Each structure stands twice: as structure tokens, then as C-alpha cells.
């Protein structure tokens, strides 16, 4: 361990001492972690007053007070486009985590984690003398926030360290787990991120308790702030409330499961998956099964993987509900300064060990909670169950006439009956789950195999393609959920080949600037930085389901792809071992279009292009999982419209955040795409120019022109008509995704830059830079080579 471990233990021991949880903390915080903003917000200017030094809610310092969003809550927010900038990284904007990880003594880290598991600390004693269960839960809850629908959540950025996740009710006491592994993080420093360490710790815990994992891939770089782009829900309360909006106020627990608001996967605000006591706290195992199937399905898990994760994960550890929740202090984000980032102070006894309180449930699933076994399914299926209350008052189940031989976590002379959660009993109250569970009861080796694969998937779901996986334990086997790509065939094309191919593309009948740019952008903007899925590498726009998305204009797309395939065939058949992929040609077609449009506008520029993309097969493409990438609206190509919960421009900003675009990059890309006439359907909506196909800043010039007045052409405010103020003649048609660049103060400020005289060349250069960035977002192979 690190040399400073002894001082760390001394400081940590202070946690066992009585601590005031109110002084200097948030006076508006409630025990469940929410805030009662209705309380009087009185000023406390004098040190002798009881409220001096506490949170004023609306401070009179920088960032405090009533903000613009308080006055105008419907104002389009661009905050998510300013997240995670290199300048915010304390390691430096050019820090290369992948390079640092390669110098890590990986086996030494694993050895230190294994040793820590049985080094029980007085300030937070280990259940059964082993932190294995706690560490598995930490990893599970870090990775388990992932949602397949939008790719957000997950453990890829180490977000469990930050609000709101660090203070979610379902993450109670995981703050202690992270503090337990801090000496290891401190020892190895920048060579391993928090994101990797939290997940690796869970993996090592499984191995140390006798389970054979599939392996582990590192490569998750840390972030340094809360990810404000994730929609966790619109509720203002946490579980056991906190699900009125996501279920549209439905309380029908038997019929509402699949009505859960998209893209959410959890049944309550503040939960990772489902309420373990049952839907809305109702101990109904059959109804719980419906919630489980929906929740796990929305994170990309099928029935087999779901049962494997529950049965495998619950082979270890226990839940905690030894005392009433009224004895627990506020979550970390509302706790006292003296708690130093910890929360949930327990006022009973030492506040830990036998008095530990987390979920309120007091359940031990197996007789060997620190050793891999099939004991979970044996107990679940072979016992009869009756509903009881935990010491904290929560609904749980106890074996009827069960044997009293389940170990106490702290007293080796005491034993208990078998216990289960309502969500556990769901596995024997659902026909499909029961079938799987009974099979594995008789064939535990199949459970071990299924759990190893499901656990690996859970931890790596948002890590992206295997080219990003680092370390000596990356398995050779690939899985369809990793969006596998084939090895590149033939020799790579060179610069001379690129020039010949661009000329061939531009001279091909049926291909023009608008179609080429639209196709390339449609292909590339499927990328999601949240889980590193999508993008043009693989040319999956030519496969199901993408080739038939309405947003991709299937008829036009088919014609463009056929023409590009002809160019591909001609080149590959006459250039020896050199081969060009369809994926490269799609991007190269857009590149050629941009260069031509710039030249036709009077600016000679070479658009950077990096060959080496490959073409995936239909067999390598999970149609269901890729269907989640289909856009509701696409502001870059003027497709679609908003919903009852999100305006068109908000969807555009959401996509821009997935593409890691800044506000200027978003602005110049949209303006350039309109100049190219690259709408999905070839329409002139937003094409504010008489020079369609030329890369001019006309979109901005005409958008900010006060001689043009805009009026909505429908009640929904999606379509707009621009007319000449004097002649009253119609000049342009626009969408919300167009007009927002003239309406929104910050976006207009950027638009005006490109509308100013003398900035034509700047506009082209900025567009090319943003274009190239988007085209290469999924080129992790280039980053590995670098």
C-alpha cells in the first residue's frame, strides 16, 4: 500500500466519532437527499446567528442569484456543449490516458485490490471480513446506469464520483467503497483512472471470491465534472417516490412497465434498476418481473443475461437495513463540510458494521456470501417464502421453516434464515425467468458461463469497439454488442489514389455535392460519444436497419450507394492489392463535395482524409440495438421534428453533444450543410441562398437580415416562412433547427460572425475543421496508431 496509508487510516477513523450532520451543511436538505426549497431563504449576515455560513441557496457571489434559466426556463441551454473541455482537465489537455495506462503495473494493482478485500477497516468494517460484495456493488452501480436507447450512463467516465450519482439513494455507502480504494488510486496515480479502477476492483473481487471472469479491458479516461447531458428523469423526488413523470402518473404496476419514459431504464429517480421491494414498494414478485424485464432490456440485456446478472451478482454479499432510516444523515452533496465528501452518517452506535443501513433491506442470499456458488438459485427455488419486514421496516421475504444457517456478517456465533428480495422472487414468478433459473439450478456451469459473459458486457457496454480496450486481460473473443468490425482487406490507398477516387466520384452520374454531403453526414452523425457506438466506420448505413430509416431517404441513399459501389468495384478491380472500402468512399464522397463547394465559392482548401475504414457485414450488426441510433430529428439535415417533451432544437443540441461539438462547431456545421443543400430529402428548407451547392455563409447573412420577416406556417411552430418586409414576397422556408440560430442570443452571436464581411474564408476553414472532426469521431484505430 501507499506510504501515506497509516495517516489515511488515522483520518478515516474519525468517521466513527459522533458528527453533526447539520452544521455548515445544506439547511434545506432532507434525509432522502432532496431539497425543500419552500423553506425561508433568509439572509444571515452576522456570525452569531444560527444560520450564518450555511447554504443560502441563492448566493450573492459568482454564479449565484437568480439566473437566466430561472427567468426563462424554456431558453435553449448550450451548457452540454461546453462540457469536458481539455482546459478543464487537471492532468493537462494533452494528457494521453491510453499511453499512461500502458505503463501501469497491472498485476500489482490487482494484487493490491485482492489484499485490500480482507483488510477490514475500523471506520467501515467489512461484512464477513471481506469487501468483495461491496466492491462488486460499486462496479455494478457504476456500469449499470447505462441505457441502450441513448447510450448515456455507464461506467465509462467515472461519473459515480459526482452528483447526482454520488448521492443517489441506490448508491448509499458506495462513497465508502471509493474511499477504501483511494490508497490504490493514490499509489498508481495517473496510470489508472477512477473509471477503470472502480470496475477493475469489482472484477478482481469476483475473481478473489472464486469466480472466473472473462477478462477486463481498461481505457476509460476520467472526466472532471458531472455529466449534465444525461436525462435521469423529470421527477423532483427520489425513490420511494420519484416515478410519477416517467410513468405519466400511472400507478397500475401490472400494466405500466413498458410505458416507462424513453430513454430511461430505472423505475424511480435515484435507482439503478428497479425497486427491490417491488413496484412502488408493493411486494408483488410477478409485477416486479415486468419491471425487471423492461429495465434490463433497456440497458441491452436479454432474459438470459438478466437472470445471469441477478443470480450471479447475488451469489455474493448482502443488503443492509439494520436500523431505521430516520437515523441516517444527508447524502454527500448535502452533508457537512467536515464529512469531506462522505454522506449518510449513521447515528446508531458506530454507524457501521452491525448497525449499517443502506437500502433498508436486510438480506443475505447464500450461506457462502464471500465464495462463488450456486447457493442463490438453490435457496430461491428450493425454499418457500413468506413476506416479512426488515429491522428498518422494508418488505422482504424469509424462508418458511428455513434452516438457520446463513452467517451473520459480524458475529460468527450467530446465524439467520434464508432471505430474499421481492425482485429475487420475480425470477420464480415469471415463466421465462423460471425456466432459465431451473435449468441453471441443475447446470451451474452454464450459469457461470452466462454470468461471466453478462458481467463482461455490463462492465464494457459503453467502452466502444475493441480497439479501445487496454491491458493484458482483454479476451480474444468478440461479441455482437461490441459492434465488431472485420480486418481490413488489401493494401491501404495512398494520397494519389485518394485524388483519383475523388475525381471518379465527382464525375459519376447521379452524384452531386448535396447528395454526397448528405450521405456522408448521415453516416457519420450516428456516432454517440456516450458509448462510442455509431459513426461511418463499418458502412452500416448500407445495412439494416439504417438503410431503411426515413431520415436516410432510402431511395436516394440506395442510388448514392450503388454509384459509390461502382466506383469501388472499378478501383478494386484495377489496382492490384490496393482496396478501398465503401465506408471510406462514403466519407471521401463527402470530402470531395466539400472541396468542390468551397472552390466554387472561391476558396481553395484541402479537406483532411484518413483512409482505413472497413465494411461490416449484416451478421456483425445487431439490428435491434442499432435501431436505437435512429434520429427522432436531425438538425444537420433538416429532418423530423420535436416531441411533446423535447423541441427540435433541443434534439439538435443533444445530438451535437454526442458529437462532442462546441456551440461554434454546431453553428458552422449547420450553416455549411444548408449552403451545400444537404437536407435529407433534397428540399430547400433552410437553404437561404441562390448559390446552392457552394460553400458560402449565405445562410447566416440572410438569417440575420432585418429585411426578412419570419412567420410560422403552422400551429406547431415547426415550419417558418421568410418574407421580404417591403414586397411581402416569400423568399425562404425554414425550420426550428434553422431559425434558432437567429433567435437564440448565443447562437446568433456566433452566426453574426459568419455573416460579417471578410469572414468567408474563416467560415470555410471552420466548416472543414468541424466536418473533419465529425467524420473521424469513430476512428479509434487512428488514435491507437498515434
UniProtKB/Swiss-Prot annotation:
Q: Which reaction does it catalyse?
A: H2O2 + AH2 = A + 2 H2O; 2 H2O2 = O2 + 2 H2O
Q: Say if the entry is tagged with keyword Cytoplasm.
A: no
Q: Which residues form the active site?
A: 141 (proton acceptor)
The location annotated for the cross-link Tryptophyl-tyrosyl-methioninium (Trp-Tyr) (with M-299) is 140-273
Where does the chain bind heme b? Answer: 314
Post-translational changes noted in the entry: Formation of the three residue Trp-Tyr-Met cross-link is important for the catalase, but not the peroxidase activity of the enzyme.
- Point out the cross-link Tryptophyl-tyrosyl-methioninium (Tyr-Met) (with W-140) in this chain: 273-299
| Localization annotation | Secreted
Query: What GO terms describe the biological role, i.e. biological process, of this protein?
Result: cellular response to hydrogen peroxide; hydrogen peroxide catabolic process
What EC identifiers does the entry list?
Answer: 1.11.1.21
| Keyword annotations from UniProtKB, A to Z | Disulfide bond, Glycoprotein, Heme, Hydrogen peroxide, Iron, Metal-binding, Oxidoreductase, Peroxidase, Secreted, Signal
Q: How does it assemble?
A: Homodimer; disulfide-linked.
The entry assigns this protein to a family as follows: Belongs to the peroxidase family. Peroxidase/catalase subfamily.
Q: What is this protein called?
A: Catalase-peroxidase 2
